Curated annotation (Swiss-Prot):
Keywords annotated in UniProt: DNA-binding, Sigma factor, Sporulation, Transcription, Transcription regulation
Protein name, per record: RNA polymerase sigma-35 factor
Pfam families in the cross-refs: Sigma70_r2, Sigma70_r4
An individual GO BP term: sporulation resulting in formation of a cellular spore
Upper taxonomic lineage: Bacteria, Bacillati, Bacillota, Bacilli, Bacillales
Length: 239
């Protein structure tokens, strides 16, 4: 059962939506209002169960209570030359898309899925923006991570498993991929096998691989990109 206070908030949202007063507009950016607190695990679970039924109050609450995630991710892109308020606005579009397309039946947390959508939305904006401006360097240091390593824009964006997998499959078939993998050293091969399940196991996130190997996630991200460049060179030799 929802706690009484949160249940009353939920009912109030339903009333506002029914009256046409509540919309998807976000008033927190640049305003005096504080961001709403994040949902508890129990509250999020209740709202996610209502989402497939088209419950607009649940949808609105899931969006508003995850705005802190948008701000957190947007701040990682502050050194790209885009105004922070614009980044938050763009990231919020990604959050709305995430809530609209989230499938509660899949074994993935909303925060994980939303983070990817928010980052992708900002990345797409950066790419569009680059057509009219000087190119943003994906190897430009943005900050320093917890281990003292430089945090690059490419590290922050992470690596979209689907994009890389489709890119590789579009270039060569699995036979050539496995042949190319044998040109890597043991550590590089292990990282690729863990990340993309190439040895028959499950695909793992960069964080999972970093924890398993005892190194930082940003280092895994950087190393992964170098490995993929090497693989592409091997592909070019074979095709």
């Amino acid at each position: 059962m929802m706690k009484l206070k949160f249940y009353l908030v939920y009912l109030w949202y339903k009333v506002l939506l029914k009256l046409g007063i509540k919309t998807d507009e976000i008033y927190y950016i640049g305003g005096s209002e504080a961001l709403p607190p994040p949902l508890t695990k129990e509250e999020e679970e209740v709202l996610l169960n209502k989402l497939p039924k088209g419950d607009q109050a649940a949808r609105s609450l899931l969006i508003e209570r995850n705005l802190r995630l948008v701000v957190y991710i947007a701040r990682k892109f502050e050194n790209t030359g885009i105004n922070i308020e614009d980044l938050i606005s763009i990231g919020t579009i990604g959050l709305i898309k995430a809530v609209n397309t989230f499938n509660p039946e899949k074994k993935i947390k909303l925060a994980t899925y939303a983070s990817r959508c928010i980052e992708n939305e900002i990345l797409m904006h950066l790419r569009r923006n680059n057509k009219n401006r000087s190119e943003v360097s994906f190897d430009e240091p943005l900050n320093i991570d917890w281990d003292g390593n430089e945090l690059l824009l490419s590290d922050v964006l992470g690596t979209d498993d689907d994009i890389i997998t489709k890119d590789l499959e579009a270039t060569v078939d699995r036979h050539l991929l496995m042949k190319a993998l044998h040109q890597l050293n043991d550590r590089e091969k292990q990282i690729m096998e863990l990340r993309f399940g190439l040895a028959g196991g499950e695909e793992k996130t960069q964080k999972d691989v970093a924890d398993m190997l005892g190194i930082s996630q940003s280092y895994i991200s950087r190393l992964e990109k170098r490995i993929i460049k090497r693989l592409r060179k091997e592909f070019n030799k074979m095709v």
